[in-house]
Amino acid sequence: MSWIERIKSNITPTRKASIPEGVWTKCDSCGQVLYRAELERNLEVCPKCDHHMRMTARNRLHSLLDEGSLVELGSELEPKDVLKFRDSKKYKDRLASAQKETGEKDALVVMKGTLYGMPVVAAAFEFAFMGGSMGSVVGARFVRAVEQALEDNCPLICFSASGGARMQEALMSLMQMAKTSAALAKMQERGLPYISVLTDPTMGGVSASFAMLGDLNIAEPKALIGFAGPRVIEQTVREKLPLGFQRSEFLIEKGAIDMIVRRPEMRLKLASILAKLMNLPAPNPEAPREGVVVPPVPDQEPEA
């Protein structure tokens, strides 16, 4: 037996370690490999390049509102395929697929709760649900959010992330633009603040209605915001668009939005703005999240 064969005979094969799926992810911008749990703790913001990745509607609302204060509104509303619409796939099949993938019934989630102890109503889009498209249920839930804000005499916050109106619902989806805008007029009559937070992307019928009707329109960094997409505009005007066209930084230079706020700073910034608008005390950034039980410092044993 040669020395190589003797070495091979003493080698014990080991089982290849398997890494569960979803433990790691890659930044869409810089390509950095990131630990999924750490990225979630960082609110889906890349710690290397500060790229703001898309966030689920529920995670966004849970990161905004005080813990233990959240109550969901309009969860009983479900979309119906009234037109029996079909393109390459039946609309009802698209709905079933999106509901299974996201766990949501439709693209908008609405909750009421408190923000640093201040009552608010908040809505957030689930972009993974058919591109966050606006149909009749999205419009109905948004109106429900407005009605709840009027009933509670409190502010309304909406986080938009949408490709626009849902083509499978045709005119019924376009009608939601007028419906939601009319509902917001009641907020204005009452003198209650409505803050619109524009995230990547906010396009089409959503940007042409309630997303741009905020008393304050805030955007996340580098969010794509507009009506038609940049490629469509380039093909229409037959000109090369400026670098960064329709991004938050471009829009704030043109006065189309009021400010850009990083996601980790969004919660305190919204609370500070609303406190001023509602003539309430400024929030204490050091205060613990409402509903979180902070353990007391244990008594020290007296020294002998």
Curated annotation (Swiss-Prot):
Lineage: Bacteria, Pseudomonadati, Pseudomonadota, Gammaproteobacteria, Enterobacterales
PANTHER family: ACETYL-COENZYME A CARBOXYLASE CARBOXYL TRANSFERASE SUBUNIT BETA, CHLOROPLASTIC
Zinc fingers (C4-type), renumbered ranges: 27-49
Binding site for Zn(2+): 27, 30, 46, 49
S-S bonds: none
Keyword Lipid metabolism (UniProt): yes
Ranges for domain CoA carboxyltransferase N-terminal: 23-292
Pfam families: Carboxyl_trans, Zn_ribbon_ACC
Entry's Gene Ontology BP terms: fatty acid biosynthetic process; malonyl-CoA biosynthetic process
Pathway recorded for this protein: Lipid metabolism; malonyl-CoA biosynthesis; malonyl-CoA from acetyl-CoA: step 1/1
Provenance organism: Shigella boydii serotype 18 (strain CDC 3083-94 / BS512)
Gene that specifies this protein: accD
Role: Component of the acetyl coenzyme A carboxylase (ACC) complex. Biotin carboxylase (BC) catalyzes the carboxylation of biotin on its carrier protein (BCCP) and then the CO(2) group is transferred by the transcarboxylase to acetyl-CoA to form malonyl-CoA.
EC number: 2.1.3.15
Comp. bias regions, Pro residues: 295-304
Region span, Disordered: 284-304
Family statement drawn from the similarity comment of this UniProt entry: Belongs to the AccD/PCCB family.
One function term, GO molecular function aspect: zinc ion binding
Keyword Lipid metabolism: yes
GO cellular component: acetate CoA-transferase complex
Name of the protein this chain belongs to: Acetyl-coenzyme A carboxylase carboxyl transferase subunit beta
Textual note on the cofactor: Binds 1 zinc ion per subunit.
Assembly behavior: Acetyl-CoA carboxylase is a heterohexamer composed of biotin carboxyl carrier protein (AccB), biotin carboxylase (AccC) and two subunits each of ACCase subunit alpha (AccA) and ACCase subunit beta (AccD).
Domain of life: Bacteria
